[in-house]
Amino acid sequence: MRRRTVLAGAAAALAGCATVEETVEGVTGPDGHPLAGEATVAAVDRSDSGHDLGALAHEAMAFWNDSAARYAGFEVTFRRADDDPPDVEIEFLDGREDLDGCRQYSSEEVLGCAPLVREGTRIERPLTAEVVARRRPYGDVLTTTQHELGHILGLGHDDDPAYVMSNRIEDRLPEYEHRVEVLDAVEVAWETRNEGTRAYNEGIGRWNDGEYEAAIPRFERTRERYAAIVDHVAAAETAAGAFEGMNRPDTVDRPRLESAFGTLRTVADLAVTAAESMRAAAEAATDGDRQRAQDRRDDASGALEELSSIDTPTPADVGRALGLVRELDDEGADAATPGGS
């Protein structure tokens, strides 16, 4: 299934860049980790993200200040670099295509990379951690930043804490199964919308050919399909209820998700109005009532005009809000717009 393919990609997208790690390990230096003790960090924002990435970097640094001794086996104190050259530079980027340090090694799903620095490694400063920040929930970007800093501290994908270092999406995202349920329901809603649109355009074809009676069942089929969108949105909302009170709630962009649900309901209502109006127009035309047919057709046109002004959220948009990052083209967008008569 397409969903499984996409989600497999999303799992890789949350990982660092393992092949680059091997390159850095091959250079030996003094005993001990080169960042043990105090290390300075500079955050460089090269993205259009709306998040406060300076604060996010500070939060990621604070996590390892508290956790490095437990998980990496040595104390580290990350602090912001002032005017001096930093030991570590965190670069926040817009997309995978901007990843420079692991471009030749990584797959297209990677959303961050950093060198794996083991004890005894000789390094050239600054060490660079790259993180894709645009169009991702705050908590998702934070986890990726913590993950890449973990690599710099010598931790791999099999090390604890799993919710930071694992490259398995199930380990990284709380309520993962419910996220998948939400995305599944939205994908079905999108497919249902496309089915309705195809039926609508078939009805318009019969209408334009003067086959008004033959158009009636097609517009009724359209109405049924568009009305069913609301049921699928309701299923998505029910699954999303699991996000209330979950750990690390900022790994889901709740406002964006709720906005998507509301917009999909509005789209469904307008599409149902258009379908019902065209069915009534076809019935009137079949009965020879030209004025009523024209009036109902105008009603449908008004609903379609309002519908065309709405930026309908796609499954990919919802996937990003859920932290199930999908950088694929939005499938079905062209098929999802009803045609006019």
Task: Kindly label every feature range from the protein language model.
Residues A43-G54, V131-D140, A214-A215, T286:
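Second-shell loop/turn segments in exported
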Residues A39-D45, G73-D98, N167-D171, R248-P255:
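Acidic helix-start/capping segments at beta-turn-to-alpha-helix junctions
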Residues G54-T144, I152:
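Metzincin-family zinc-dependent endopeptidase catalytic domain
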Residues E119-T121, P126, E130, R135-R136, ...:
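Metalloprotease/metallohydrolase-associated module, dominated by Zn2+-dependent proteases
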Residues Q146, A189-T192, G196-Y212, T273-S341:
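C-terminal amphipathic alpha-helix
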Residues A60-Y71, E148, I152, G156, ...:
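Structured segments of extracytoplasmic/periplasmic soluble domains
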Residues V24-A60:
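Fold-level signature of zinc-dependent metallopeptidase catalytic domains
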Residues R2-V20:
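N-terminal export signals
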